[in-house]
Amino acid sequence: MSDLFAPDGGWRVRILDLSGGAQNNIVEEIGGFETLMQANAFARRYVRDSVELCRVPGTTAKEVLEAWFAFGEDAEVIDAGEAGWRSATELGDFVDNPAGSEDRDWRALDPRRIDEDDEDE
């Protein structure tokens, strides 16, 4: 798929609750991403932040990973196929290397926030 042919309403990212607390593990779907690159970056940062929320001082990478699978949230870009970002490709790196604040800042890419900022102007 190409960024030139975004679905109506833009690309959508599905947030999945790994703890099983939500129906079908789906917490929410966030729409309105103008490009696939933005949707992928949002999904990546969202998962990165979720991993960091599971990191407790003194825990090993294995313990962080176990905590994420038990309590974390995953994200996927809907209908992006092979072009969509997948947490499995970077999860090992995420648990091995703590993230800085910019790598976790999914809110800066959230189209819901961007829409709110536009209304304030």
Language-model segment annotations:
Residues 1-2, 121:
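Classical N-terminal secretory signal peptides
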Residues 37-42, 54-58:
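Glycine-rich loops and low-complexity Gly/Arg-rich segments
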Residues 48-121:
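Short, mixed-charge low-complexity intrinsically disordered segments
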